[in-house]
Amino acid sequence: MRVNLLIAMIIFALIWPVTALRAAVSKTTWADAPAREFVFVENNSDDNFFVTPGGALDPRLTGANRWTGLKYNGSGTIYQQSLGYIDNGYNTGLYTNWKFDMWLENSPVSSPLTGLRCINWYAGCNMTTSLILPQTTDTSGFYGATVTSGGAKWMHGMLSDAFYQYLQQMPVGSSFTMTINACQTSVNYDASSGARCKDQASGNWYVRNVTHTKAANLRLINTHSLAEVFINSDGVPTLGEGNADCRTQTIGSRSGLSCKMVNYTLQTNGLSNTSIHIFPAIANSSLASAVGAYDMQFSLNGSSWKPVSNTAYYYTFNEMKSADSIYVFFSSNFFKQMVNQGISDINTKDLFNFRFQNTTSPESGWYEFSTSNTLIIKPRDFSISIISDEYTQTPSREGYVGSGESALDFGYIVTTSGKTAADEVLIKVTGPAQVIGGRSYCVFSSDDGKAKVPFPATLSFITRNGATKTYDAGCDDSWRDMTDALWLTTPWTDISGEVGQMDKTTVKFSIPMDNAISLRTVDDNGWFGEVSASGEIHVQATWRNIN
């Protein structure tokens, strides 16, 4: 008995120190972070989102869910250098080659994070994504992201699209609170097999409650409005077809054209902010250098103007609260410099954009958005254009297939401008196509690509003799002659005294819905459901023997 007892005591003495010295991750629970306000940008022109601090930066909820034209790609000025992310407010650094988990409790959305956010041009980060992928993700967060060597990395989690969609639907003035868990360890665990940082023998685990309030929602509206502008060699603009809100205007000693280029709504909870700046920027560096600051100006009301000069002039968030539009003025010298630089046949969406800078968040406070309206700028000497007669960039139709169903009709306006009428004008339709029985058909497909349905298509216009000419178009990428269309001529005189003319006509692209061939697929199978297609209509004009 005594021997057995002694043995038991010895065993107990040997086991006890092992239990007492077992290591674990160090867990720190921080005091709740102060509530922070954010501004949410809903960009319907470019189909993306942006979130930015309305006041203090930390804890962070900042950045866009998509790259813009300001993305840094390794050269030039550094603007947008990561996508949107969150942190707990301490901006804690990470150790190279350690592993990192971040997960949320009381998350406002399922699957809120995609991985470890990093600055895209730092060594060890992905220039394309600004993301270090974890071993796995779940409905709460991500796990097993290896901290790469090179530039600094912090406890930042990249936001998922689901998180942005939640922020979008939040009413202005509402708040959410979540618990951010951030854990790093030197232990090389396998998160894909279920292991987690918090369960390892060493490391640091931080826990903090953060609260964010939606202080404002800026909705950028895509009006799809379209207008043509023809410019002569001296830069004098002439408005063509379109419904964009444009007018000729003189500001000081400069004459030119002003247009309402951005439409927006801004709802706030009374937030006051002057760190958010909005201003336009010319995309073409040569043109930006050639024009003066006052050759391009912008305004919130169309009457008081600011020059465009990089970041020097801007409107603040507070100033934008009293308006719902941004106007842009282009002087004749602006257009003249376009001619001198060889810039023609250009869309304003490719010519300039608006920039959004929040000086509070230098790494993720840059954003860019397109205009709500579009101007098609063309030279008045020897040019051709085609626009929808609805004055929209992307006209669309929908219908049903079957006997007696109406065709999908699209109307267009074709304009030529030159010293004389064009000697030849051609038109063609491009899109998904297939030849069946010697005839080309436009092909519409289901979302999964399994159903491909043929549709005939035609181009038609009124000739100068009053007859309707119809071509079988079939999306076949073949030119058809429309020189003999009925053109409406308007003469013009250049500032130099040279004369010319602008000629306009209309053309209709039609897709019948009642042709029997469209009841079956290209593989001769029956089908049901929805199919769709997109394509383009191109025009070209030729002038001969012009001195």
Curated annotation (Swiss-Prot):
Transmembrane parts of this sequence: none
A GO cellular-component term linked to this record: pilus
Signal peptide: 1-23
Induction section of the entry: Negatively regulated by H-NS. Positively regulated by IHF and EcpR.
Locations listed in the record: Fimbrium
Keywords recorded for this protein, A-Z: Fimbrium, Receptor, Signal
Domain of life per record: Bacteria
Main function: Part of the ecpRABCDE operon, which encodes the E.coli common pilus (ECP). ECP is found in both commensal and pathogenic strains and plays a dual role in early-stage biofilm development and host cell recognition. Tip pilus adhesin, which is required for assembly of EcpA into fibers.
Oligomer status and interactors: Forms polymers. Interacts with EcpA.
Protein family: Belongs to the EcpD/MatE family.
Entry protein name: Fimbria adhesin EcpD
